[in-house]
Each structure stands twice: as structure tokens, then as C-alpha cells.
């Protein structure tokens, strides 16, 4: 009889563990799909410019760009760097961080030389995919930090989608609907990267930290190379408040989830 009880107990524990893993699997898909869907949502807002041009004065557009920069900075300061420095020594921290910046620099040079419509799509993926990988791996260790990172990625992807769609449609023959469709397909990469981070990388804490710092270094380069210069508008002082708002929302999210 005791052996039967032990067998039943082990079976229940295994079943509970399987259910927990399945629930985490579904949550990660949701957490990575929402930030991905934010890209086509932001792109669809760019299409409203043709309907109501007065809504999209230059000050509003620059404020939206600045908001995305603030959200990106929040991701670096509140999630990626704190998670990244946990498991690495100072030398590796510096190497991973600067490697991310160097990789984004090389990508920026390559995209500038090519100057193709796909450049904007590649630029968006270059920070979205590493962040989704880090999200999945982080969720395995701290669910609160994973939720926070998902929210911050969504905040940054809305203005990124908006800005990228505007640039693509203005320089090519592609319509807003076509760009929105492309961004929607890109959103599916989020769950793939997130699940990879959760099931493959979560057991390698040093590698997760390295990826987080790599993404942080690249994003910081991106902020000051591309986003901050676009946010500045001569004789207008309100757009930088968008960056403050983006960062503040990241801070409030951190407070709310207790990460």
C-alpha cells in the first residue's frame, strides 16, 4: 500500500510539473507575441497621416520617436543591464556590452551602404529578436522581470513600427497595408525567440547574461546614433518629454510588477 501511495504521489507531481511547464509555455508565447504585434499596430497609425494630416505635425512625430527612445533606455537600465551583470565578471561584462555596440555599428554601416527598403525591417529585428531571447530566458528565472521586459518591448515597438512604416512608405512604392503585413509576419519571430530562450538558454545563466548585455550595448548605440538625433526639432522643446514619458512608463512598470 505505501508503495502505491508513493507511485500516485510521484505521478501527481510529474503531472503538476507538466501543467506548469505548459502554462509557462503559453504565457511566453503571449508575452512575446504582444510586443511583436505592437510593430504592425504602430505601423497602422502611420497610415492615418493621409486621413488627418493635421494630427501628425512634426512635433508630434518627433515626440513619438523620442518616446520610443525612452522606452528603449528603460529596457537597458531596468532589465537588460541588471540581469546581465548578475553572472559575469567585470571583464566579460565590458566585452559583451561593447560587442553589442560594435555589432550594431557594423550593421548600421552595412544597412547604410545597401540603402534598401529592407533596412528598416532588419534594424527593428536586430533589437527585437535578442530582447525576445532574453525575455524567455529571464522568465525562467524571474516571471516578474519577464513580464516587465515584455511591457517595455511593446512600448518601444509601437513608435518603432510607426517610424519605420513612415520611412519605408515615403521612400518606396510599398503601401501601408503591405508594410503592416510584413511587420505582422515579423511578430511571429517573437514567440520563436522567446521559447528558444526559455527551453534552451535558461539553464545557461552566463549565456543569458551575455545576451542581455549584448542587446543592451547595441540598443544604447542605436539610441544615440539613430533615435536621439531624429527626436531633436529646432525651436521646439516638447519632443524630449516623450523620452521622459517612455522611460517613466518603464519605471512604473517595474514598480507595478515588483521586479
Label each PLM-derived region with a short phrase.
Residues 2-259:
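Intrinsically disordered, metal-sensing/regulatory segments
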Amino acid at each position: 500500500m505505501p508503495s502505491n501511495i508513493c507511485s500516485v504521489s510521484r505521478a501527481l507531481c510529474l503531472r503538476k510539473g507538466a501543467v506548469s511547464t505548459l502554462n509557462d509555455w503559453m504565457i511566453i508565447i503571449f508575452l512575446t507575441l504582444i510586443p511583436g504585434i505592437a510593430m504592425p499596430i504602430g505601423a497602422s497609425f502611420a497610415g492615418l497621416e493621409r486621413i488627418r494630416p493635421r494630427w501628425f505635425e512634426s512635433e508630434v512625430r518627433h515626440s513619438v520617436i523620442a518616446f520610443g527612445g525612452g522606452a528603449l533606455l528603460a529596457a537597458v537600465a531596468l532589465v537588460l543591464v541588471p540581469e546581465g551583470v548578475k553572472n559575469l565578471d567585470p571583464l566579460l561584462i565590458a566585452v559583451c556590452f561593447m560587442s553589442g555596440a560594435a555589432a550594431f555599428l557594423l550593421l548600421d554601416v552595412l544597412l547604410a551602404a545597401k540603402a534598401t527598403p529592407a533596412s528598416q525591417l532588419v534594424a527593428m529585428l536586430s533589437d527585437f529578436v535578442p530582447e525576445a531571447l532574453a525575455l524567455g530566458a529571464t522568465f525562467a528565472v524571474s516571471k516578474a522581470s519577464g513580464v516587465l521586459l515584455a511591457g517595455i518591448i511593446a512600448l518601444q515597438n509601437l513608435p518603432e513600427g510607426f517610424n519605420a512604416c513612415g520611412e519605408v512608405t515615403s521612400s518606396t512604392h510599398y503601401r501601408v497595408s503591405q508594410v503592416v503585413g510584413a511587420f505582422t509576419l515579423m511578430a511571429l519571430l517573437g514567440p520563436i525567440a522567446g521559447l528558444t530562450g526559455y527551453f534552451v538558454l535558461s539553464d545557461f545563466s552566463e549565456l543569458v547574461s551575455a545576451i542581455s548585455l549584448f542587446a543592451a550595448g547595441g540598443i544604447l548605440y542605436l539610441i544615440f546614433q539613430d533615435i536621439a538625433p531624429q527626436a531633436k526639432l529646432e525651436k521646439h522643446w516638447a519632443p524630449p518629454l516623450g523620452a521622459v514619458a517612455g522611460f517613466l512608463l518603464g519605471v512604473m512598470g517595474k514598480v507595478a510588477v515588483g521586479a
